[in-house]
Design a protein with these regions (language model features):
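Terminal low-complexity, poorly structured segments
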Residues: 5, 9, 14, 19, ...
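Low-acidity, Ser/Thr- and Arg-rich intrinsically disordered low-complexity segments
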Residues: 6, 10-17, 23-36, 41-49, ...
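Generic detector of low-complexity/intrinsically disordered segments
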Residues: 11, 15, 20, 25, ...
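Trp/Phe/Arg-rich N-terminal binding region typifying the photolyase-homology
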Residues: 57-247
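Glycine/tryptophan-enriched, flexible segments
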Residues: 79-80, 220-413
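Short, intrinsically disordered, charge-balanced linker/junction segments flanking boundaries
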Residues: 421-424
Length: 424
């Protein structure tokens, strides 16, 4: 059975759970506890989304915040579409995923099955056995979980550069709506822009990257302190807008039909390929000199195991020992965050639940300081500054600066520092 709807703190959304202490407002808030509970209940109900598109202004949707949704191609849902297509490219997980939640809600509203399409190309920069194996192990878990719930999942691993060309368009031809992940870096922005011109149906990109939506502001912050002050002003409202823990419970649990010609031309990845066996990897045109990691496995299961290890062993000493390589104090979660196998919302909720934290502990005013604002133990505040401030500063920059990867995009103080040490 799927897990119950969850607010991100592993707390089932029931009338009783809405009084959980982690959701109690800080003392200075003008809202009462009961009003906050009502807000939380409302956020889990289907609602009317307005202001996104005149063509679907009356579509009832669940509470994926508007600030997380970009309409890349504004069309009404295709009449006669056979399914809703979720094109999984960044948030490669079936839990705590705003994009999957949004796609599942579309499927429910249109009374259509959901088709999850997770591709892996070979032509990306630095493609290697190590990176491929990491992603493939996550795909194995995603396929098994989707099948258990009766949701159609199509894993496609490109055997040669360009072999997957046309597959997205072919799947989208039968889709009422296409939902995908919004991600501001690498080749993904170009890929989404190209898809918006090639597809002939509604295309929406949904941001699951951070606690605060990366496009909630168009201001680019050149310093962590400035961004931290912005976060401290905005975070409280976003802490009540976590993704549903198990969004597939809301999808139509019936198969989505994929045409035979699609399966013949773009066959689903075999068990051998998804297992990332040496033979399977050797047949792919990727860098075989960079072998799979012998100690780090991809996938949500390994991500959650690493998080559990960190909570027990690393977090208590994080503020003192995170920069000491032999201490095992760092979280080690970066690979799974990078490939979308675990969400920042889940990490935050596990950390704060262990700390016994509630929003009542927040400082009444933003300070921009690294310590003291959360009202949490020193080790927790140090970790949150890395997990939220520094990580989401990068998303803010990349989302608002198309030239984020160019030297000229660096703020003057950073360029001055680099130039001063050019001869080091």
């Amino acid at each position: 059975m799927p897990a119950p709807a969850c607010n991100g703190f592993r707390i089932p959304l029931t009338r009783r759970s809405l009084a959980h202490p982690i959701f109690k407002p800080r003392a200075s808030s003008k809202k009462t506890e009961s009003s906050c509970a009502a807000d939380d209940r409302t956020s889990q109900r289907p609602r009317i989304r307005t202001g996104v598109s005149s063509s679907i202004h009356n579509a009832a949707m669940t509470a994926v915040p508007d600030s997380r949704i970009r309409v890349l191609r504004d069309e009404p849902p295709r009449h006669g579409g056979r399914y809703v297509l979720y094109w999984m490219i960044a948030a490669r997980r079936l839990e705590d995923n705003f994009a999957l939640q949004h796609a599942a809600d579309w499927a429910r509203q249109l009374d259509l099955p959901l088709l999850i399409f997770e591709p892996l190309r070979v032509g990306y920069q630095w493609a290697s056995d190590r990176l491929h194996a990491f992603v493939l192990r996550g795909m194995v878990e995603n396929r098994a979980a989707a099948r258990e719930l009766g949701v159609t999942y199509h894993a496609y691993v490109e055997p040669a550069p360009g072999a997957g060309k046309g597959l997205l368009e072919r799947l989208a031809r039968e889709a009422a709506v296409v939902v995908t992940d919004d991600y501001p870096a690498f080749f993904l922005p170009r890929m989404l822009a190209a898809a918006a011109t090639r597809l002939d149906c509604r295309l929406e990109a949904v941001d699951s990257n951070g606690i605060v939506p990366m496009r909630a502001t168009t201001t680019v912050y050149p310093t962590a302190r400035g961004f931290r002050r912005y976060l401290q002003k905005e975070l409280l409202s976003h802490l009540g807008q976590f993704p549903v823990s198990s969004p597939l419970q809301f999808a139509e649990h019936r198969p989505a039909a994929i045409d035979d010609d699609v399966r013949r031309r773009w066959p689903e990845a075999t068990d051998e390929v998804l297992a990332a066996t040496p033979d399977a990897l050797s047949r792919l045109p990727i860098d075989h000199a960079v072998e799979p990691s012998p100690t780090i496995d991809g996938g949500p299961r390994a991500a959650h195991a690493r998080l559990a290890h960190f909570l027990e062993h690393g977090l208590p000493i994080y503020h003192e020992a995170r920069n000491q390589p032999d201490s095992d104090a760092s979280s080690g979660l970066s690979p799974w965050l990078h490939f979308g196998h675990i969400s920042v919302h889940r990490i935050f909720s596990e950390v704060m639940t262990q700390a016994g934290w509630t929003t009542r502990r927040l400082a009444p005013k933003p300070t921009g300081a690294r310590e003291g604002w959360w009202g949490a133990p020193e080790s927790v505040e140090a970790f949150l500054d890395e997990l939220i401030t520094w990580r989401e500063l990068g998303f803010n920059f990349a989302a608002n600066r198309p030239d984020y990867d160019q030297y000229e995009s660096l703020p003057p103080w950073a360029r001055a520092s680099l130039e001063a040490h050019a001869s080091d």
